[in-house]
Amino acid sequence: AVVKPVISAAVIGKTRNRKILSTGGARAGQDVIMTKWAGTEGTAILAKEWEEGLRQYLTEEELQNAQAMKAYLSVGKESEIAFAYGATAMHDATEGGVLGAVWEVAECSGLGVDVFVEKIPVKEETKKICKAMGIDYLGLISSGTMIIAAENGERLAERLQEEGIAAAVIGKLTESGRYMLVNDMRLPLAQPKSDALYEAKL
């Protein structure tokens, strides 16, 4: 049952120079760049809604840090930087988290992808919360985290970092096949299901 207000919105905007970057504009051989951290919004939500229960797993400072992640939900600045750099696809990692967003970029672009799981940035607070609540932070809503497809991803990551935005290359787009590379293992990257947020419990 719906127990909280739900708001739906239709948004209309104008493009600059008639150029639009879609989720499906990636090309094989490009790098996958990620901004900020896995589970950005989900961490803030869980730390607020389950604050009392989480006190036995996190220090007061860690809880405050986790709740403060709500300040990082805008992707406007990195979008402008990536657009100017020449990125061909971008996707905000909302429901389904980082892995869901990467899968959607590959799916919409008709491509495969290799995801370097160990290179995905994540806050220690997020790890602790997800461990306590029995969920995977890679599938946790990550609004504020942008997934970008571009050539020479390391250079773009450096450009983002120069502007104070955490960024890392976490994958490579391929002609076919979608995989996660974990501890020298090559595991299938499956289509995202429900967000880990809905499975969280103490």
Model-derived regions, located:
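Glycine-rich anion-binding loops of enzyme active sites
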Residues: 1-51, 172
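Solvent-exposed alpha-helices and their adjacent loops that cap or buttress functional pockets
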Residues: 1-4, 23-27, 45, 58, ...
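Active-site glycine-rich loop that binds ribose-phosphate moieties when present
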Residues: 8-22, 60-82
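Alpha/propeptide regions of enzymes that mature by internal proteolysis
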Residues: 10, 157-161
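Active-site-proximal betaalpha loop/short-helix elements
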Residues: 67-142
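A short beta-alpha structural unit
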Residues: 143-149
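Helix N-cap motif at beta-to-alpha junctions
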Residues: 149-155
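Acidic, Ser/Thr/Pro-rich beta/coil linker or hinge segments at domain junctions
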Residues: 161-202
